[in-house]
């Protein structure tokens, strides 16, 4: 029983969407970017960084994927290209107290109300953490773990201009004659970010698809926005992520 319900490749009965906990990799940069914009509302556009593929921050060596050199990047470009070195540079200067508060607000270490059991995502950085933990954390590595369900909910909030609706499974129940006997009424669960910041993230997520790492989704068949991620897995196969939404003008579907 443990073999088929534990989090391993042979676990055929594990609901990975709600029960699997994985390092989010670069999909976590959504929150790092959000915190940076909240702390620098009038100057975040002035961020500039020269990427040569690797850097050392707080005695930790960080490289971009395959040591790719992105050259000079601003925040939007660093996000679209998923530039690790740019993000650890800006992330190392964040107000840790505010950053911890943002992660709590965005459902880390929290019970998520849902019809199915959901494991708590883990965010372990605190004001007392060693500074060497910060570089890995801000790019979605280190001790941070998320369920795909949680990651999808964060994207729902971004697509919905900052407001997260309470998730549910059953839309309505019908009687034998086809009439609706019970209906789930959508309700607001929480405002995770301001509408202004959500719209900034929407633009950045769109650029991931049109000119960044999510280019495979750039098609005439539909429009999409989102964030890619690759998380190291202790010498095993890496965890590959994509979280995003379709129909960018009027978002209708979030996937993770």
Predicted segment positions?
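Beta-lactam-recognizing serine transpeptidase/beta-lactamase-like catalytic domain environment
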Residues: 1-26, 31-256
């Amino acid at each position: 029983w443990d073999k088929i319900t534990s989090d391993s490749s042979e676990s055929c009965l594990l609901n990975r969407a709600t029960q699997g906990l994985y390092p989010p990799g670069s999909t976590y940069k959504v929150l790092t970017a959000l915190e940076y914009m909240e702390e620098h509302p009038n100057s975040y556009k002035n961020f500039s960084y020269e990427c040569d593929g690797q850097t050392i921050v707080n005695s930790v060596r960080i490289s971009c994927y395959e040591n790719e050199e992105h050259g000079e990047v601003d925040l939007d470009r660093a996000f679209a290209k998923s530039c690790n070195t740019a993000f650890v540079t800006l992330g190392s200067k964040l107000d840790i107290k505010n950053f911890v508060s943002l992660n709590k607000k965005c459902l880390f270490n929290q019970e998520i109300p849902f019809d199915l059991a959901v494991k708590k995502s883990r965010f372990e950085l605190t004001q007392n953490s060693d500074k060497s933990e910060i570089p890995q954390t801000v790019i979605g590595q280190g001790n941070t773990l998320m369920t795909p369900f949680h990651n999808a909910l964060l994207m729902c909030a971004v697509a919905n201009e900052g407001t997260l609706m309470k998730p549910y499974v059953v839309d309505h129940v019908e009687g034998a004659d086809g009439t609706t006997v019970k209906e789930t009424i959508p309700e607001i669960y929480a405002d995770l970010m301001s509408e202004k910041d959500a719209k900034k993230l929407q633009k950045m997520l769109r650029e991931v698809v049109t000119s960044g790492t999510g280019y495979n989704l750039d098609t005439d068949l539909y429009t999409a926005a989102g964030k890619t991620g690759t998380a190291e897995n202790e010498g095993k196969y890496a965890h590959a992520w994509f979280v995003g939404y379709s129909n960018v003008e009027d978002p209708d579907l979030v996937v993770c």
